[in-house]
UniProtKB/Swiss-Prot annotation:
Family statement: Belongs to the prokaryotic/mitochondrial release factor family.
Pfam family, one: RF-1
UniProt PTM: Methylated by PrmC. Methylation increases the termination efficiency of RF1.
MF terms (GO), sorted A to Z: translation release factor activity, codon specific
UniProt modified residues of type N5-methylglutamine: 230
Keywords carried by this UniProt record: Cytoplasm, Methylation, Protein biosynthesis
Residues making up the signal peptide according to the UniProt record: none
SMART domains hit by this protein: PCRF
Family annotation (PANTHER family): LD18447P (PTHR43804:SF7)
Subcellular location per the Swiss-Prot or TrEMBL entry: Cytoplasm
Coiled coil: none
Name this polypeptide is given: Peptide chain release factor 1
Function description: Peptide chain release factor 1 directs the termination of translation in response to the peptide chain termination codons UAG and UAA.
Length: 351
């Protein structure tokens, strides 16, 4: 591992020299990108090397010093350095882990009310609010691609495009069944009801990764409708795209024009086709490895939200927090960061 870190540091230094001599602006940009990727690892490795030097100096003091007070201080410093070395080495191991190729991607996030009738749709709306607040805290951009409100309030489904930095690395653990336990506003007896919403997070497909021939897509237009199906305009601005080879169909009416709805529908369609490809690949990979943090499948129950007890439980890692009210205000890192750490531990154990 240390040999690998030395190679990375040497590469970083070579790139720094190249940058000083490079005149081509495009080449400079590429070099700067590569430097920024290597910089966190090199900085941490330099910290580790400094600790090694300090440790050697302390060892010398312990061998040569006679003063008991200084020896006591040196022993304390030695323990501190050893602890810092271990922490730094663990951090370096994580930085050297293979990166998920999708981690830097934007995502399309879909939320659907599932079992539990109207309460499921209300919970879907609550989840939407939470994810939007979380995205805002990260300075991510959120665009609603398609939104289907339910008749009695809440949402039957919604699809968002979330754009920004390293989004999939944070949100990829959100796919699955989210279960809510609470007393509905209409419940006169005060009984707790259980309902569910399904979340699906898919990395946004790029043109180079997925080629779709427009000859394979059927386009239908129709009038936009509101909750309950009533028509809300007289022009056919809503669009349905059907990918004939896969049978995947997407309808979109959120935009103000047919052109806007067609663009949004195509974004969703690409994502669903892409997800179909990724799911098949993931199923094959899951046959060969244990995945403690979950499969990411939409049928997997991942989390329970218990409102009467202000409790949230992530079933994949056995995490329980009495902070549901805070988390629903967008503080999702309280759950997501432990999931990331558990996934890293799993990777380290398998590497």
């Amino acid at each position: 591992m240390l040999d690998r870190l030395k190679i990375i540091k040497q590469k970083y230094q070579d790139l720094q020299k190249l940058l000083l001599n490079e005149q081509n602006i495009n080449q400079k940009i590429d070099i700067l990108k590569n430097l920024s990727k290597l910089e966190p690892t090199v900085e941490l490795f330099n910290r580790y090397l400094n600790l090694e030097t300090e440790f050697t100096q302390i060892q010398t003091i312990l061998k040569t010093q006679q003063d008991q007070e200084l020896l006591l201080l040196a022993h304390q410093e030695k323990d501190t350095i050893l602890s810092e070395k271990k922490t730094t080495l663990d951090q370096l191991k994580i930085l050297l882990l293979p990166q998920d190729p999708f981690d830097k991607k934007n995502v399309v996030l879909e939320i659907k009310g599932a079992s539990g009738g109207n309460e499921a749709n209300l919970f879907a709306a609550d989840l939407l609010r939470t994810y939007v607040k979380y995205a805002e805290s990260k300075k991510w951009k959120v665009e609603i691609l398609n939104l289907n409100p339910s008749i009695k309030g809440g949402l039957s489904s919604v699809e968002l495009l979330i754009s920004g930095k390293n989004i999939y690395s944070f949100l990829k653990y959100e796919s699955g069944v989210h279960r809510v336990q609470r007393v509905p506003a209409t419940e006169a007896q005060g009984r707790i009801h259980t309902s569910t919403a399904v979340v699906l997070v898919v990395p946004e497909a790029e043109e180079l990764e997925l080629k779709i021939d427009w000859h394979d897509i059927r386009t239908d237009t129709f009038n936009s409708s509101g909750p309950g199906g009533q028509s809300v305009n007289t022009t056919k601005s809503a669009v349905r795209l059907t990918h004939i080879p896969s049978g995947i169909s997407v309808a979109c009416q959120e935009g103000k024009s047919q052109h806007e709805n067609k663009d949004k529908a195509f974004t969703i369609l690409k994502t669903r086709i892409y997800n179909q490809m990724l799911t098949a690949k993931q199923e094959e990979e899951n046959k060969h490895r244990k995945n403690l943090v979950g499969t990411g499948e939409r049928s997997e129950k991942i989390r329970t939200y218990n409102y009467p007890q202000n409790r949230i439980t992530d079933h994949r890692i056995g995490l329980t927090l009495q902070k549901l009210d805070i988390i629903m205000e967008g503080k999702l890192d309280l759950v997501i960061e432990p999931l990331i750490h558990e996934a890293q531990k799993e990777q380290l154990a398998q590497s």
